[in-house]
Each structure stands twice: as C-alpha cells, then as structure tokens.
C-alpha cells in the first residue's frame, strides 16, 4: 500500500507548473501589498486575505484532482438551479457591499451574530457554475450551434442568470458575464453574422436600456469616461487613483511608502492597482500585468490542447474572467473606464472573489490533468 506522501506527490504532479507559479506569485504580491498598507487597511484585511489564500490553495489542490467531466455531467442541472436560487435569494434579501445609498443588492449576509458579520457575493461563485453549465449546454447542441432555436435556448440560459444579476444592480459583474458568454459562443463556432446582428440589436436597444439603469449607474458610466467633469463626486475616486499611480513614478515609494492611496476609497479592492503602482511604481504594475498575461496565455494553451469541447469552453470562459477583470480593474485605476466595482484578479482583498478565482483555477488544473491522463493512455 502506497504511503500518503507518495499519493500526495502523485496528485501534486497533476497540477500545471506554470499555472501554479503564476497563482503563487500573484497571491504573494497581493499579501505583500496589503501588508505594506496594513496601517491604512487594518490588520483584519491582512488576516482575512491570508486565510483566503491558504483556503484557496487547498481548494485548487482539491478541485484539480476531481474529474471535471464527471462533476459537470453529474451536477450541471443542479448547478443551474442552485445559481438561479441563490441569485433570486440575493435579489430579495441582499444588501449593498460598500454604499448603502445605492440600489445595489449583490451581497448576502450569512452570519450576523453580535459583532460577527459575514457576507458573501453570490454572483462571484455563480461565475463558476455558469461557466460549467453554459459549456455543458453548448457541448450538447454543438452540432446545431448555428440554428436560431439553438442560440435562442442558449440566450435564455444566459439571460436568466445575467438578468438576475442586473436586477440586483451589479452592473460590473453583469458585464463580465457578458464577456464570458460572447467568448464562449465565439469559440464554439457561432457564425460571425450572429455577432453582427447582436451588435446592431444592442445599438437599437441602448436608449431603452439606458433608461432602465439607476441614476447612480448612469453617473458612473458618464463620468467614468471623463471623471474631470465631476472631480468632487463620481469622478473623485478615479482621479485620486490616477494621482496615486503618478505619485509612484517608475520604481514606487516603497512597501510602506505612498500617501495618496490612504485617502482613496476601496484602495484595497477595486483600486488596489493604484496602491500597487504607488508602492512599487511602473515596474510593479507592469510585473503584475506580465504575470496575468502569462497566466491567461497558459490557460488558452491548455484549452487549445484539450480534445474535449466542454474542457476547451471551460478554459476559454475562465480566460475571459481574467482578461475582462484585469482590463477593467486597470482601466478604472487609470481613470479611462467607468467605475463599476470590479476586483483585480488575485490582487484585490476579499473573500468571495478570491475564493471564486482559486476554484476556477482548480477547474483549469483539472482540465489539464484529465487531458494528460488521456494523452498518456493514447500513447500507450
């Protein structure tokens, strides 16, 4: 009988080295940034992020050793029903995470005993179940993917989830879902003419959709592209973030240096890229971008090497999350994109978003491990 150590090493070898290295580097960089700003963020943020990191790596190891095909094939209906249920519960009983004056109801309190209050953002975890169920749905109808009734079914599937998120007021997360949907459909071979028709429909529907947005959401978008128009209101965060980045210069103010980030709201979450740049300069910001780029490229390579359609689509969906959230997170910090409440992957402090990212990386590890297993079987 093999020892636990031997079995552990064998399971560890199933994990992809590049993915693991990138995840480790980004996690360490996040902890280092929060540690350097502990006087401003508070020790609780550091302790929470440290705990989420350890739990996250355990989840990566756990999920990487699960057969993703068996998991999704067995649970995809339950995953979809759970997603609808938890988003509906959040819509009915949710609270705003940061600003109670907004109509955002994207957080759900699960523990509220005395001074102990634990809230989660279900839409972050639903990203995982949505990618799994949408990939499964596409794989079931791939032979008739360009038939209108097939696409209608896929749009209903996606529309239920995105609609519930929009109703909760979480515009930023809804946009990430939209990007995931488009990339997964594109990679599944949907005709380009459907995308052209979709863009035309969006342009026609835009004036009506605009009226459906809450006033604070409209303001975020309008002043997001030009924060100078409202420097003491909606544009203030973006402009302060931009100042923090400029204050960092090329090499930064040091781990415990910098001052602009101290007054910047959400400097440990949505605007943590500004904190990174003020402390570690252009070099630190560029380093983060390079590591994320390597991570995304590796995920795409794993998708390209996968012979299973569902595995491919899972990886492409995960890559969409990293691409969109990184671009939006950096764009917000540079004051060139609207502030829509998007966390920076493996950098922003937080429980829900951090654990969700570790879980989806675990799924990519699983896809890679299963492909290796079947590859060796074919070689033999």
Describe the function of each predicted region.
Residues 2-13, 18, 32-168, 320, ...:
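Membrane-helix boundary/helix-loop-helix interface segments in multi-pass membrane proteins
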Residues 23-30, 83-90, 295, 322-325:
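Helical transmembrane-bundle signal
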Residues 37, 152-185, 214, 280-284:
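Helix-loop-helix junctions and helix-breaking kinks within/between transmembrane helices
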Residues 58, 66, 133, 208, ...:
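Transmembrane alpha-helix boundary/anchor motif
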Residues 99-111, 115-119, 196-287, 309-311:
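Hydrophobic, glycine- and aromatic-enriched re-entrant/interface helices and adjoining loop segments
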Residues 138, 180-194, 260-284, 342-357:
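Interfacial segments of multi-pass membrane proteins
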Residues 175-185, 200-203, 293, 360-362:
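Hydrophobic transmembrane alpha-helices of multi-pass, membrane-embedded glycosylation machinery
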Residues 283-326:
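Hydrophobic transmembrane alpha-helices and their immediate junctions
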């Amino acid at each position: 009988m093999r020892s636990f150590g031997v079995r552990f090493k064998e399971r560890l070898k199933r994990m992809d080295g590049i993915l693991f290295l990138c995840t480790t580097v980004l996690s360490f960089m996040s902890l280092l940034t929060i540690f350097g700003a502990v006087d401003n963020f508070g020790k609780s943020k550091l302790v929470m992020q440290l705990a989420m990191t350890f739990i996250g790596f355990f989840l990566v190891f756990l999920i990487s050793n699960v057969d993703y095909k068996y998991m999704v094939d067995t649970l995809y209906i339950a995953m979809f029903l759970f997603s609808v249920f938890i988003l509906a519960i959040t819509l009915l009983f949710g609270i705003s995470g940061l600003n109670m004056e907004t109509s955002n109801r994207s957080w759900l309190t699960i523990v509220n005993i005395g001074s102990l209050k634990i809230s989660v953002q279900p839409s972050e975890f639903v990203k995982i179940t949505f990618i799994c169920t949408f990939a499964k749905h596409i794989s079931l109808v791939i032979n008739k993917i360009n038939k209108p009734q097939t696409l209608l079914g896929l749009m209903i599937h996606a529309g239920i989830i995105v609609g519930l998120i929009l109703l909760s007021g979480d515009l930023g997360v809804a946009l990430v879902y939209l990007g995931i949907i488009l990339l997964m459909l594109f990679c599944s071979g949907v005709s380009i003419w459907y995308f052209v028709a979709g863009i035309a429909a969006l342009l026609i529907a835009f004036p009506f959709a605009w009226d459906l947005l809450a006033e604070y959401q409209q303001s975020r978008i309008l002043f997001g592209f030009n924060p100078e128009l409202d420097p003491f209101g909606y544009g203030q965060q973006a402009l302060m973030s931009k100042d923090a980045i400029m204050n960092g210069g090329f090499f930064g103010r040091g781990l415990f240096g910098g001052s602009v980030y101290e007054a910047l709201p959400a400097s440990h979450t949505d605007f943590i890229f500004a904190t990174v740049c003020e402390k570690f300069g252009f070099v630190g910001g560029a380093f983060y971008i390079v590591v994320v780029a390597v991570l995304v490229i590796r995920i795409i390579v794993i998708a390209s090497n996968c012979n299973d359609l569902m595995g491919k689509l899972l990886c492409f969906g995960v890559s969409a999350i990293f691409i969109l959230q990184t671009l939006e997170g950096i764009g917000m910090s540079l004051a060139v994109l609207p502030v829509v409440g998007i966390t920076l992957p493996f950098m922003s402090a937080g429980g829900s978003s951090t654990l969700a990212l570790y879980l989806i990386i675990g799924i990519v590890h699983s896809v890679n491990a299963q492909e290796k297993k079947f590859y060796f079987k074919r070689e033999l």
